[in-house]
Amino acid sequence: MFAIIETGGKQILVKEGDSIYVEKLEGQEKSEVKFDKVLAVNDVFGKPYVTGAVVHGTIEKQGKAKKIVVYRHNPKSTHKRKLGHRQPYTLVKITKIKGK
């Protein structure tokens, strides 16, 4: 059984037992999460969401991605700027897909 869920502005294809990286979700590790914005379950497609469909998961890890370095330099002056950014993420293991 598979489903397409929407979380963090992205659409993700999931199956039971999959581990997925999503944008940061509130919650502690080992806590349960529910995704109710389900776009499709097997061959049932919603308009825009499938009513009554829920995907259950468990938060495995809260973390940050690798650092991305942004460097700006204006060659006509001495202005230089170096920034770093680490995007927070949540690792979720899909435990159950409940469809229609």
Curated annotation (Swiss-Prot):
Pfam families: Ribosomal_L21p (PF00829). Signal peptide: none annotated. It comes from the Bacteria. GO terms for biological process: translation. Transmembrane segments: none annotated. InterPro entries: bL21-like, bL21-like_sf, Ribosomal_bL21. One of its GO terms (cellular component) is ribonucleoprotein complex. GO terms for molecular function: rRNA binding; structural constituent of ribosome. Keywords: Ribonucleoprotein, Ribosomal protein, RNA-binding, rRNA-binding. Part of the 50S ribosomal subunit. Contacts protein L20. This protein binds to 23S rRNA in the presence of protein L20. Belongs to the bacterial ribosomal protein bL21 family. This is Large ribosomal subunit protein bL21. It comes from Mycoplasmopsis synoviae (strain 53) (Mycoplasma synoviae). The lineage of its organism: Bacteria, Bacillati, Mycoplasmatota, Mycoplasmoidales, Metamycoplasmataceae. The gene is rplU.
